[in-house]
Amino acid sequence: MKYEIKRGSSGAEKDTAIVWNEDETRFTSLVDSDDAAYWVDFELDAPIDDSFIMIPACAYNGNRFETVNRGYPPMFLESEMGVDVPVRMAPLPHLEPKGDSFMDVTTGDMATPCVCVLRKSMKQAFFVFFNQESHELNHGVTLEQTGDKLLIRLRAPSKRRLVYHMARMSVEPESDPPMSVKKGDEIVIEHRVFTLHCDSITELYRLFFEKRQVLYHGAPQANLPFSRYWELAEKRMQDHYIEKDGYYAIKAADDRFSKFSNWQAGWVGGGISTLPLMVEGSELSRKRSVDTLEFAGRTQSKAGWFYGIWAEGKIYYDDFEYYGERYSITMLRKHADLTYYMYRQIESLEAMGYEVPEFVKNSARRAADAMVTVWEKYGQFGQFINAETGEIVVGGSTAGGIVPAALCLAARYTGDKRYACVAEAAGELMYRTATQVGVTTGGPGEILQAPDSESSAALPVSYLELYEMNGDEKWLERAKEAAYQLSTWVVSYDYHFPKDTKFGKMGILATGSVWASVQNKHSAPGLCTISPIAYLKLYRYTADVNFLMIMRDIAHFIPQVASYPERPMLTNSGKPLPPSEICERVNLSDWEGRSEIGGNIGGSSVWPEITMMLTWLDIPGVYAVPSRGIVCASDHVNAWLDGGELFIQNTTDFDACVKVLIEDDEKMKRKLGAYWQDMFKRVSVPSGSTVHISANID
C-alpha cells in the first residue's frame, strides 16, 4: 500500500534538526522551549467503504458506529430496542461512518502502540508500530479522514482536540501538558512500517499477531506463586458464603454494599467461582459450591432463564432499574456463562467421583433449552432477553459468544444432538458476524454495544469446543483467527507508568494485562471471566509457540496486582485490600483523569480474583514439551530443561506448589475436555530454591 510520510515540528524550521531512517525519526531541539511539539504524518488512500482501521483495544473498524449520548452506565432506550438493531455506543473516540471526521487518542489508550489499515479491494494492509512516549509524556495519535484520504499523525507529546472521560467527550487542553525541552534535547518517534498483502480482516489480525510477538516483549518478574494466591483466595471466599441462602455471593460480607454485591449470574462470578472451589478446594468449599449451583437453579425463571441479579430474596433485572418488570431484562451473556460453567462443574464433579444433584442437572438442561428455544425463534441470541418470556429485547452483538461452547458441553453430557446442531449453527453466525468482520460486542452489560474484549475472549473457547466435538478443521482455523483478534486486547509491552503513580512506585509491569473495552478504557488483570486456556489448547493443536507466550503473559500478570499480607494493595482511601483481593483497574489511559493513571484502586472487583482462581485451576504453572525444547513458565517461577530433567526455580518469598504438565506429540493429541486437572504433576518448590524432576513422559 502506498503512503506519503512527512515530518514537522513546532516553532521555526531552524529551531529543530531532523534526521530519520526507516524505523524512527529523531528531532533535536536547537533552542529552549516550554511548549515543543514534533510529529510524523502518514497519508494514505483509505476510502471509508473500502477500509478497515484497527488500533489495538482502542478502535475497531475505526469505531464507525452510531453514538448516543448517555451517562454511565448507559442503557438502551425503548425506541432502540428490537431484534435487528445497529451497533450503538456512548460517545468515545471514533471516526464517523460517513463524511470527514477525526479522532485523537494517546498511546495510553492502546494495548499495543500501533495503527493497522486494510484496503479491502486492493488486498493490502498498512501497519505502523511506534513507541509510547518521549520525555515521560505519552505520544498522541490522530486519525483524520478527509474524503478518501486518511491521515495518521504520531505526535510528541499528545494534543487532543477532544478528550475522553467515562462515556463523554470534552475540550480539556489541560489534559495534555506541554513538553519542555532544552537546547540539545532529543525526541524520538519510532515508526516501524509494514505494507503487506492481506486478503481479509482475519488475515489482518494474523499479521498483527505475528508482528506483535516479535516487536514487543515484557520483562520477567515474580512476586506471588499461583499456589500461594490460591491459599489466600480460598480462605477469603468463605467470607462470601451466605449460610441462610446457601450460596457464594459476589462479594464478602464485609464488602457487600449493594444488590450487585450479592448474586449475579455468570459474568463477574456467580456460579463461576464454584468451579475452582469444588475442584481444588476443601470438602467445605466443594459442598458450598454444589449448594451454590442449587441456589442458581432457584433463581431461574419458568422459561429457563437465569435472573441477572438476586439480593435478599428479591429479583432484579439487568436494566439499572429503568424498566423493571416491563421487560424483565436479563443479560444473555450472564445466562450463557452460567450454563457453560455449570456443565463444566457437572463433568468435573463426576470425573472426581462425586454425585451431582438431579436438580442441578435439570437446571443446566433447562438453561440450555432456553437458548435453543430463542435460537429456533430468532436465528440469533441477542444481547438482552426477557427472562419471563424468552423474547429478545435487544438483538445483535456477540453477547452469546460462549453459547456454542455451552451447548457443546450440554450435547456431550446429555447426548442430545439438538444442542450440537444449534451450537454449530450458532458458531457459524458468530464467525460470520464477529470474527470475519473484525468486531465483537455485547460482552459487558453497561457499555451498550461498544467493542469489548469479553465477547472476544469467548469465541476461541467456543470454536475449540466445536472442533473437539466434530473434528472439523475449519473450527480450529476459526479458533486461531479469533485468538489473533483477542490478542489485540492484551498489552504487549511494559507500559511506563509515571514514577509518582501507585503502579510506578510498585514497579508493576503491564505486559499481559487485558483491556476491557473501547468505552471502559482501562486494562485489567486477566480475561473476564475465564482463564487463557484457549491459548494452551491452540498450542497443543498447532505447535505455534506464540500461543503459549501470550497465555503465559496473561496468566503471569495477574498476581502482580493481588493484595497479600506482605505487600497489601492500598485503595484510594489508604485502606489495604484484604488478602487475595484484586481491583480491575490497570489504568494506562487518563480516562479517569491524569492523576488516576497507574491508580484508582477503588476496591475489589471480584471477577479478577475468580479469573486468577480459574487460572490456577486450568493453566499449568510450568508446561514442557522436551522433544521440542519447549518450556513455558506461567507461574511466578523460572523453568528450564537440562540433561533430561526439568528444573524449577522459585525466587519469591513464598513456598510454591507448581502444577507441571509435560507432554510429547502423542500426549498432545488428547482432548482436554471439561476436566484435565488430573494430568498435572504437583511439585513443591521452597522459597529461594531450585528443584528438578525427570522430564520423561509418563
Listing of model-derived features with the role each one plays in the protein:
Residues 2-10, 181, 185, 198-263, ...:
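Low-complexity, Ser/Thr/Pro/Gly-enriched N-terminal "stalk/linker" regions
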Residues 17-24, 28-183:
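Beta-strand/loop-rich accessory regions of lumenal/periplasmic or secreted enzymes
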Residues 178-200, 686-696:
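Short Pro-Gly-centered flexible turn/kink motifs
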Residues 222-223, 278-293, 345-365, 408-424, ...:
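Structural helix-adjacent loops and short alpha-helical linkers that scaffold large soluble proteins
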Residues 261-280, 289, 326-348, 391-412, ...:
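Well-ordered alpha-helical segments within folded domains of soluble proteins
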Residues 286-337, 359-375, 379-383, 426-431, ...:
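Helix-terminus loop motifs that line ligand-binding clefts
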Residues 428-443, 470, 474-601, 619-638, ...:
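Non-catalytic carbohydrate-binding regions of carbohydrate-active enzymes
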Residues 637-698:
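C-terminal beta-sandwich/jelly-roll accessory domains of carbohydrate-active enzymes
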